[in-house]
A protein has these predicted regions:
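Conserved SAM-binding loop of SAM-dependent methyltransferases across substrates and taxa
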Residues: 25-36
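Conserved SAM-binding loop
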Residues: 52
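A short glycine-rich, Lys/Arg-flanked "PGG" loop and its adjoining helix->strand segment in the class I
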Residues: 100-112
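Conserved class I S-adenosyl-L-methionine
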Residues: 117-148
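A C-terminal cap/extension of S-adenosyl-L-methionine-dependent methyltransferases
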Residues: 160-240
């Protein structure tokens, strides 16, 4: 899906440079490697980077994978300028006080004609708190639970047996939660420009997960500030 969408803005062909920040096991970069793009992935998880390297080696594709916190990764260490930077399910995890810093740092790696793709769930959508990572079936399937007051949310997670690391991660996500309005304001604050936006009622990734056909949010809902956050399971942006 990335390829079809991004080709509207950049010709995806052999030799262009692609960077994914928060690349995980490298799955998002594989379609670009298949088209002989130069792909680079960075992730702060050493285990995920090892998995990405093994995955690409197994399939016989070239890819460069770097274990580092992106904030610690200097553009002086990487002389490449990237035609496309992918940032999917990352910005909503960044502390609110560092989001603008993150955006500005990402732009340092962008070529003059390059674009940044952003994908994130609107904070107020039913599972915007990523509570699906909970081990307990009730917590993982309960929509909007992340919107409860902090003390109540913490108590529920504890009562239903979530471990300390899971609770900590979920509370960090709650503290960093990102709405559509907030994202657009920090893009503006970082002197960025929004080239395109798609708000999804049914996330394209749900097609593979749940066999659901992707559906865009109705234009009338997309235009209603704040309310649209409750219905946007994924937000796609192209910025410069």
């Amino acid at each position: 899906f990335y390829i079809d969408y991004l080709e509207k803005f950049v010709a995806i062909k052999r030799g262009i440079n692609i960077l994914e920040i928060g690349c995980g096991e490298g799955g998002n970069l594989l379609p670009f490697a298949e088209k002989e793009c130069n792909v680079t992935g960075i992730d702060r998880s050493e285990e995920r980077i090892s998995q990405a390297i093994s995955y690409f080696n197994l399939l016989g594709f070239n890819g460069r994978f770097i274990h580092s916190d992106f904030f610690d990764f200097s553009s002086e260490e990487d002389m490449n300028k990237y035609d496309i930077i992918l940032i999917h399910d990352v910005i909503e995890h960044i502390d609110k006080c560092r989001k603008v810093e993150f955006i500005l740092h990402a732009k340092e790696f962008l070529s003059e004609t390059g674009i940044i793709f952003w994908g994130f769930p609107a904070w107020q959508m039913p599972f915007g708190g990523h509570q699906q990572i909970c081990r307990n079936g009730f917590c993982s399937k309960m929509p909007f639970i992340h919107l409860l007051p902090l003390s109540v949310y913490n108590k529920i997670l504890f009562i239903f047996g979530e471990n300390d690391s899971c609770i900590k991660e979920l509370l960090n996500i709650k503290a960093a939660g990102l709405s559509i309005e907030h994202f657009e304001s920090i893009i503006k604050e970082s002197n960025g420009r929004i080239v395109d936006r798609i708000l999804w009622f049914i996330n394209p990734h749900y097609k593979q997960k749940f066999k659901l056909k992707p559906r865009k949010l109705m234009p009338i809902l997309s235009s209603i500030r704040y309310i649209r956050n409750y219905f946007s399971t994924s937000c796609f942006y192209i910025t410069k």
